[in-house]
Amino acid sequence: MKPKLVFLPFLIFITVFIEESEAVHPVVLETKLGDIRGNEFFFLSKKIRTFFGVPFAEPPVEEFRFRKPREKKQWKKLFDATKPANACFQTRDNYNTSFWGSEMWNANTQISEDCLYLNIWAPADAYNLTVMVWFFGGGFYSGSPSLSIYDGRALAATQHVIVVNINYRLGPFGFLYLDHPDAPGNMGLLDQQLALHWIRQNIVSFGGNPDKVSVFGQSAGAASIVAHLIAPGSRGLFKNAILQSGSLENTWAINSPFRAKQKSEKLLELVGCNKTTVENSMSCLRLVSPEQLSLSTWNISLTYLEFPFVIVSRDKHFFGHLDARAALREGDFNRDVNLMIGMNKDEGNYWNIYQLPQFFDKAEPPELTRHQFDNLIDSTFSIQPDIIRSAAKYIYSDPNCTDHGRKTRFYAGQMNQIVGDYFFSCDSLWLADQFFLFLQICSTPNGSLKNPPKVFVYYFTQSSSANPWPKWTGAMHGYEIEYVFGVPLSYSKIYKRREQIFSRKIMQFWASFAKNGTPRLRVLKNSEHWPEFNEHNNYRWMQLRSGSNIRPIKRRKETECQFWRRVKDTEYTAYLTQEYSSSCHINSYRILLFIPFFFIFSAF
């Protein structure tokens, strides 16, 4: 990114943080595991307590690297919980080290394999409060519960809830898979699950009600929450779930056992640990430095928006007897949870800047010709057969544009939409439909649910005046988070008044949903009534935008998402073939995709 884009430097955030901070006093709590010391201070005229770096598991180091997490043992001495949790081992985004737009997502605390800790914010008078548990995103290769954008003090102070940010292992440390006890896969999900169990057992000491736990997460965090809806061991650990721009069905979020093992074996080869037995290979791998392991993961061959180590769809410990992808289609998931599912208007722009910098890494709004647009679809979706790419070009093109050599903003905008739709939004909408479908089945006279949970859908279109990226990027992937955590209130000097008001409303929606399973404002205008996602309400969404633009809207993206759903259904058929046939090859995938797409293309 060019230096002229760096108009929101890190120093601004540091300065404002110091100005907003009040006098801090120590506070000590008794817990089942031992005494713990945190801090107490006033924020927005409310007394808040923080307990940072609280351990929920034993360190997963040395012989326990790559293995399931172990419960934290009791401690005898006073535990100091005044420093934010370590980040789990990861590489840094070196896109531009002087640009806050990328640096804000890099770990801001020590990076370590010893990282299974929580950060907790609670009102000083907390008693029997709702608990909101945050799952951070980052593609399962980066992220931290301690990023400044995830500071829970504003949410705790204004909504009178307890906020808990959990941590989990990333990359090969959390998702290496060899179908073996030494590398069982989904260790990061097991970390999350253990954190939820810890919260259920210990949050009462902090003033929380273990029966009033809700989870919310973004991107990989949202995909993780969907995994917990499926996992037998996560049942009963939370009542409500908010999924921000992510679902387990997202292509980047989940691998088949075949693909997960393929990547893991490649990593063994890259670091010289491909021994004759898994036991010997893992003994070797546990001796490799974490730095070398993290860097080597990026030498694995990946497609567009494919991440190195992610959730594996079948394993013995987290999903148990279930295949996660099949479970979503067959309704084999927890239906006793209210869901809020949403997407941002400009999900794709963030990824296009990184993946297609020659076209999108610009200060001014990018423009593309129709020829360039077609070529970018071919490269972005190169693993898809020609007929799918042709159908995508047809659906996302402008039939009135006959000059294919003229550059326009329209086609740059369509690249934003096509990447956002395929990799994020359409899977979220499918999950909303799927969840509602099975709720309807279960709430029939012969069904099992007397009071079925509710589903709500949002469409976030608000950009930020403090966003360091150019204005044309809009409401990108991840840029609703600052409003959810009340960043405009914490850093009021760099946000407009209307953005602060909007952030308060977003926090109210989120906290109301966490408390009651329904997103509501305390002072409600008629237009701000959030309709439930159902047939009676014509499956309407809630548009989230400042001013008078918080209002229900008609469902969008129907044609686009119907198309991508047919693609995903055919990919699922290929997945089944790959997993259950001993003679599968990539060519069978392409053949399976091609056969039905004559009919899919003709439908448009």
UniProtKB/Swiss-Prot annotation:
PANTHER family according to UniProt: ACETYLCHOLINESTERASE, CARBOXYLIC ESTER HYDROLASE
Protein name, UniProt field: Acetylcholinesterase 4
Keywords: Cell membrane, Disulfide bond, Glycoprotein, Hydrolase, Membrane, Neurotransmitter degradation, Secreted, Serine esterase, Signal, Synapse
Job of this protein: Rapidly hydrolyzes choline released into the synapse.
Predominant place of localization: other
Signal peptide annotation: 1-23
Any Pfam family matching the protein: COesterase
Enzyme class: hydrolase
Source organism per UniProt: Caenorhabditis briggsae
